[in-house]
Amino acid sequence: MEAVLNELVSVEDLKNFERKFQSEQAAGSVSKSTQFEYAWCLVRSKYNEDIRRGIVLLEELLPKGSKEEQRDYVFYLAVGNYRLKEYEKALKYVRGLLQTEPQNNQAKELERLIDKAMKKDGLVGMAIVGGMALGVAGLAGLIGLAVSKSKS
């Protein structure tokens, strides 16, 4: 599963699917499969703007898809949001998938990895806040010491 989350699309694949998407768009009608393939490539890009664009394309597809297609759309919506570190959104999508498919092992594993990332980021965030609080307390102590020395 971590390979799916960390896999980067090749520039060549991205350009090929982008050309196909733009060609169909210019002709006036983009097929669901072309839009999904392009979105799937964008979600695997190393650039956040590409990932966001892929998410938008997947969200557009969601109401149009069959049950099987929707499962794929929701899964890659979770992957895209995970890659953007939008863990709450990723969790929302993966849990929605697990409501309809409680035995989906891929979704269970993705949920576990999202929870793990949230805990890691939460601990890192708490450490940063804690370090800042210690820094402020230390600075206040130094100021207090300087003031008391200047009075004596």
UniProtKB/Swiss-Prot annotation:
Cellular compartment(s): Mitochondrion outer membrane; Peroxisome membrane
Keywords noted in UniProt: Acetylation, Apoptosis, Membrane, Mitochondrion, Mitochondrion outer membrane, Peroxisome, Phosphoprotein, TPR repeat, Transmembrane, Transmembrane helix, Ubl conjugation
Assigned GO CC terms: mitochondrial outer membrane; mitochondrion; peroxisomal membrane; peroxisome; protein-containing complex
Gene Ontology MF terms: identical protein binding
Gene3D superfamilies: Tetratricopeptide repeat domain (1.25.40.10)
Domain of life of the native organism: Eukaryota
SUPFAM superfamilies: TPR-like
Biological process according to GO: apoptotic process; mitochondrial fission; mitochondrion organization; negative regulation of ATP metabolic process; negative regulation of fatty acid transport; peroxisome fission; positive regulation of intrinsic apoptotic signaling pathway; protein targeting to mitochondrion
Primary location class: mitochondrion
Membrane topology type: Single-pass membrane protein
Modified residues (N-acetylmethionine): 1
Coiled coil: none
Mitochondrial intermembrane-facing ranges: 144-152
UniProt KW Ubl conjugation keyword: yes
Cytoplasmic side: 1-122
Post-translational modification: Ubiquitinated by MARCHF5.
Residues recorded with modification Phosphoserine: 10
TPR repeat placement: 71-104
Pfam families: Fis1_TPR_C (PF14853), Fis1_TPR_N (PF14852)
InterPro entries xrefs: Fis1, Fis1_cytosol, Fis1_TPR_C, Fis1_TPR_N, TPR-like_helical_dom_sf
TM region positions: 123-143
Complex formation: Interacts with DNM1L/DLP1 through the TPR region; may form part of a larger protein complex at the endoplasmic reticulum-mitochondrial interface during mitochondrial fission. Interacts with MARCHF5. Interacts with MIEF1. Interacts with PEX11A, PEX11B and PEX11G.
Role played: Involved in the fragmentation of the mitochondrial network and its perinuclear clustering. Plays a minor role in the recruitment and association of the fission mediator dynamin-related protein 1 (DNM1L) to the mitochondrial surface and mitochondrial fission. May not be essential for the assembly of functional fission complexes and the subsequent membrane scission event. Also mediates peroxisomal fission. May act when the products of fission are directed toward mitochondrial homeostasis, mitophagy, or apoptosis.
Family classification: Belongs to the FIS1 family.
Domain notes: The C-terminus is required for mitochondrial or peroxisomal localization, while the N-terminus is necessary for mitochondrial or peroxisomal fission, localization and regulation of the interaction with DNM1L.
UniProt name for this protein: Mitochondrial fission 1 protein
Native species: Mus musculus
